[in-house]
């Protein structure tokens, strides 16, 4: 009798994706983040669903409803903090996943990479609209500042902003539609993730060496299922440590003050995972220029396959490129720090230098270094 998992139309898909999938035998823990992102997404959808049962998307009651969830709903506080800190975990995994792709040259899988970039944008959009929902001071002013950036678009900018707001300022209409977006986007992310996986399974996984591994494949189950379960357990441990010991560590105290359009907080800043992009935005004194730099800082990822000049796929055997990669990581950490600092000397200058270095490394230094390394191979 044939195994049902190999014949049943639905089970066959699951089998080919998670059980009998041929996987390289040497993929390291850096390949765990894909499955961890799946775990994060499921966790966010489930906690979000339970929060939505008690949340009201009205300017008069939104803040109170979040307070009600934390104080009166059974285990509401843990659901709320798992959702808020789950977003931080999501972004940590995302950054690691993208970093892995850059380091090991996974961007040469064009379709997979491009859908990944679209996924990154979608997750960022979801996190942004979600941050507005508690309707605290930082929610309100964050929404005002970031949506206002669209007014920098020539000719249609102002109309576009008012269309998104549903009025002449961030108000009830804005909050209601942001809740609608925040509810629908995770399901779009789930669908995109499936397409991401579909394209990945067309080519098979990359591996740390960047060399084709067709000659040395092992079944995904049990080898990588057990490895992914370990990763998921560690992720859960780290998340629950955060939730149970310092749930507000990554949040902004200003968001515990109800939104007040008449009182601007001294330092408007987004959540930590947007700070690097926010620093790039602020480092350019011109509004449109800042917006373009902000979008380019993420959109630049699409250019990675075009900027790859090396004869080798992975950075594993390219020490100079490795140095540049880690300088880029340090630069992004510097930008994240600057994004949370007030706009004054010396932070402005550091931010501008770090922003220039970011684009310089990706657009100039990395391709040039790769070419030099190609020539060194001839020696």
Swiss-Prot record:
Q: What else is known?
A: Heme 1 (or BL or b562) is low-potential and absorbs at about 562 nm, and heme 2 (or BH or b566) is high-potential and absorbs at about 566 nm.
Stored PANTHER family: CYTOCHROME B (PTHR19271:SF16)
Please give the CDD domains that the UniProt record associates with this protein: cytochrome_b_C, Cytochrome_b_N
Q: Where, by residue number, does heme b b566 bind?
A: 97, 196
Give the UniProt entry's GO cellular component terms. Answer: mitochondrial inner membrane; respiratory chain complex III
What are the recorded Gene Ontology BP terms?
mitochondrial electron transport, ubiquinol to cytochrome c
Q: What SUPFAM superfamilies has UniProt attached to this entry?
A: a domain/subunit of cytochrome bc1 complex (Ubiquinol-cytochrome c reductase) (SSF81648), Transmembrane di-heme cytochromes (SSF81342)
TM ranges are 33-53, 77-98, 113-133, 178-198, 226-246, 288-308, 320-340, 347-367
Database matches in Pfam families: Cytochrom_B_C (PF00032), Cytochrome_B (PF00033)
Cofactor: how bound: Binds 2 heme b groups non-covalently.
User: What is its biological role?
Assistant: Component of the ubiquinol-cytochrome c reductase complex (complex III or cytochrome b-c1 complex) that is part of the mitochondrial respiratory chain. The b-c1 complex mediates electron transfer from ubiquinol to cytochrome c. Contributes to the generation of a proton gradient across the mitochondrial membrane that is then used for ATP synthesis.
Gene name tied to this protein: MT-CYB
Molecular function GO terms recorded: metal ion binding; ubiquinol-cytochrome-c reductase activity
Predominant cellular place of this UniProt entry's protein:
mitochondrion
- This protein is called what? Cytochrome b
Topology in the lipid bilayer is annotated as: Multi-pass membrane protein
| Protein location | Mitochondrion inner membrane
- Name what cofactor the protein needs: heme b
Q: Carries keyword Metal-binding?
A: yes
Among InterPro entries, the record links this protein to:
Cyt_b/b6_C (IPR005798), Cyt_b/b6_C_sf (IPR036150), Cyt_b/b6_N (IPR005797), Cytb/b6-like_sf (IPR027387), Cytochrome_b (IPR030689), Cytochrome_b_C_euk/bac (IPR048260), Cytochrome_b_N_euk/bac (IPR048259), Di-haem_cyt_TM (IPR016174)
Name the positions where heme b b562 binds: 83, 182
What's the domain of life for this entry? Eukaryota
Q: State the family named in the UniProt similarity comment for this chain.
A: Belongs to the cytochrome b family.
């Amino acid at each position: 009798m044939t195994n049902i998992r190999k014949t049943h139309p639905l089970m066959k898909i699951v089998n080919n994706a998670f059980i009998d999938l041929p996987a390289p035998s040497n993929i390291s823990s850096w390949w765990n983040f894909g499955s961890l992102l799946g775990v994060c997404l499921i966790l966010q959808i489930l906690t979000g669903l339970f929060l939505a049962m008690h949340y009201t998307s009205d300017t008069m009651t939104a803040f109170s409803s979040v307070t009600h969830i934390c104080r009166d709903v059974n285990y509401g506080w843990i659901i709320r903090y798992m959702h808020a800190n789950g977003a931080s975990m999501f972004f940590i995994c995302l950054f690691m996943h993208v970093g892995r792709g850059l380091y090991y040259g996974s961007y040469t899988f064009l379709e997979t990479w491009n859908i990944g970039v679209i996924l990154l944008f979608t997750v960022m959009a979801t996190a942004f609209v979600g941050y507005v929902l508690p309707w605290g001071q930082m929610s309100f002013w964050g929404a005002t500042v970031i949506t206002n950036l669209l007014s920098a678009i020539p000719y249609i900018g102002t109309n576009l902003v008012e269309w998104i707001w549903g009025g002449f300022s961030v108000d009830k209409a804005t909050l209601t539609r942001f809740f609608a977006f925040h509810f629908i986007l995770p399901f779009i992310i789930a669908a995109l993730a499936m397409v991401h996986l579909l394209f990945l399974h067309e080519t098979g996984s990359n591996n740390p060496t960047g060399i084709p591994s067709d000659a040395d494949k092992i079944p995904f189950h049990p080898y990588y299922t057990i490895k992914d379960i370990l990763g998921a357990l560690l992720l859960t441990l780290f998340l629950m440590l955060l939730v149970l010991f310092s749930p507000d560590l990554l949040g902004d105290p200003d968001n515990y003050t109800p939104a007040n359009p008449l009182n601007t907080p001294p330092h408007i800043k987004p959540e930590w995972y947007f700070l690097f992009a926010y620093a790039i935005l602020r480092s350019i004194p011109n509004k449109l220029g800042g917006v373009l730099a902000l979008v380019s800082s993420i959109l630049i990822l699409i250019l990675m396959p075009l900027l790859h000049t090396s004869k080798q796929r992975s950075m594993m055997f390219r020490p100079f490129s490795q140095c540049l990669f880690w300088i880029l990581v340090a630069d992004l950490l510097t930008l994240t720090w600057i994004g949370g600092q007030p706009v004054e000397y010396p932070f402005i200058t550091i931010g501008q230098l770090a922003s220039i270095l970011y684009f310089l490394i990706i657009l100039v230094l990395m391709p040039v270094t790769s070419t030099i390394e190609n020539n060194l191979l001839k020696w």
